[in-house]
Amino acid sequence: MIRLDHVTFGYGLQKKVLRDVSLEIPEGGRLCLTGPSGEGKTTVLRLLLGLEKPRRGTVSVPEGTAFSAVFQEDRLLPWKTALENVALFSDGETARRCLAALGLSDSLDAMPDTLSGGMKRRVALARALAHPFDVLVLDEALTGLDGGTKTQCLAAIDQAVGHRTLVMATHDESEAAALGAEIHYI
């Protein structure tokens, strides 16, 4: 069980982004954070990943939990091909399979600067899906994808997650519905 218990957080002297937030995510659960921009969805994900520390409250994650994540920025290594970017955290066969599941079989040897924005998003997603994980964290991972590509990606995410845990932030509640995720408004 992953827990946020009465968490309060703010950046620097800025107003509090999160105020007394409590969440429980059971092992194998699927949770979607949604709400207006700037209300703390990404911050909750960063707290779960240990990238930020709360001002007050506690974040509890079982020891040894392996995370894999896709952030709003794709962060591909520009000197590596699509396949090499995905294979950083997996074997070549798993990387190929994940890229194929996301419709990128023809782009294995492409360099990031030759890929469209949507293709870069899918390479970043393939990298996260190929990495061994207990919890998959997606921060607006499907933003900017067309409807057909988004549907293909949702199917790949659903299959890859299986009975493991998914925590995602999105403005598109249909993504949560497609993945059977409980919706939590922030």
Regions found by a protein language model. Give the residues of each.
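Helix-to-loop junction immediately C-terminal to a conserved catalytic motif
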Residues: 49
